[in-house]
Every structure is written in structure tokens, then in C-alpha cells.
Regions:
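Non-heme Fe(II)/2-oxoglutarate
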Residues: 2-72
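Amphipathic alpha-helical recognition patches that constitute DNA-binding helices
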Residues: 4, 87, 116
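Catalytic core of Fe(II)/2-oxoglutarate
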Residues: 94-95, 102-113, 122-182
Length: 182
């Protein structure tokens, strides 16, 4: 299951959080560049600007977690203040993320991971550059992605909330073609 929420944040807040992102050349980014992915990520609370810090805190709060839990029924969710797999993510020109499964057991809490939330926060993004996340069904026999369920465009202030179980295939398989300065 998944849900796409446009205007996820107040517009002014989303614009202000976008301005808190570190620059593309900032040395604090953790760089991934391998056969599966080409991206940068940062999940250090000490580096977040104050608005991002408050947003991450809210997304891990009982108030927000209980709202998301409604989507899952009887599943009990726990917040992840360590932001394992979370935080800032940046895909520049040439970026990609092959269709994949995330790790399903949290490395520190030993709990099953259940939810991913992606919030697109690049207002000047042109949809023609790519960056669409694709969500796929699971092929039980071959243990691989089977059919694409949805391809979600990276629209500013759009959130994509989806399950991240051991069968939740997703990715950005098409190489991003934005200008180098975006």
C-alpha cells in the first residue's frame, strides 16, 4: 500500500526547509556511487537546520506516527530517531536508484521497518529531468519486481508514503538528467 499527498507541508515551510539543504558540493554528504545507486544522503541531526530538525522530530512524534498507523491497521509503528535510511537525500544529474528492496529489519532496534516517507523539496524541479519514484509488486516465485504499480512524479511538496516490507520494491531507475547546477 502507498499514498501520495500533495501539499504535504505548509508551502512557506516547505520552501524554507528547501533552503536549509546543504549545497551539492558540501563535504558532509555521504556519497553513494555504485551499480545500484548514485546519490548523496545525510542523516545527522546536528547538521539539520532548525526547521528541518523540527520536521524530523514531528515525523517521529507520537502524533504523526499515530496518523500513519491508521493506514496500516493493526501494525504497531515505532519512531526512528536514528533516521536509518532517512534524512536528506539528494540526486544530482546522473543520479539513480535501481528498483530494490530496503533492508526490512532495523539495524539498531531489531524491529521490522514498515514505512518510508519521501518528501520532494526542490521547487525548481522540471519533471522532464526525471526523479520519478516507481513502486512495484513482488514476484513470489522469482523474488524480484513484477509489475509497476505507480510512477510518482517528483512534484514540489509532494509526499509519497509507502510500506517498506521485505516485498516492497521501489526505486528511481531512470537516470536523472537535470542541469549540473540543480
Amino acid at each position: 500500500p502507498h499514498v501520495v499527498v500533495d501539499d504535504f507541508l505548509n508551502l512557506e515551510l516547505a520552501q524554507a526547509i528547501e533552503k536549509e539543504f546543504p549545497g551539492m558540493d558540501d563535504e558532509r554528504w555521504y556519497k553513494y556511487n555504485n551499480a545500484i545507486e548514485n546519490k548523496k544522503a545525510l542523516n545527522n541531526w546536528e547538521i539539520f537546520g532548525p526547521l528541518t530538525y523540527n520536521l524530523m522530530n514531528y515525523l517521529n512524534s507520537p502524533a504523526f506516527v499515530s496518523k500513519v498507523q491508521v493506514l496500516l491497521g493493526d501494525v504497531i509503528l515505532s519512531p526512528d530517531f536514528g533516521l536509518n535510511g532517512g534524512g536528506y537525500h539528494l540526486h544530482k544529474s546522473g543520479g539513480k536508484l535501481n528498483v530494490h528492496l530496503d533492508y526490512s529489519i532495523h539495524p539498531k532496534m531489531n524491529l521490522e521497518r514498515r514505512i518510508n516517507i519521501i518528501i520532494y523539496l526542490t521547487e525548481a524541479w522540471n519533471e522532464a529531468w526525471g526523479g520519478h519514484i516507481s513502486l512495484w509488486t513482488h514476484d513470489e516465485e522469482k523474488h524480484q519486481p513484477k509489475e509497476m504499480i505507480e510512477k510518482v512524479a517528483p512534484q514540489f511538496n509532494r509526499a509519497v508514503i509507502f510500506d517498506t516490507t521485505c516485498n516492497s520494491w521501489h526505486g528511481l531507475p531512470e537516470t536523472i538528467t537535470c542541469p549540473d547546477d540543480q
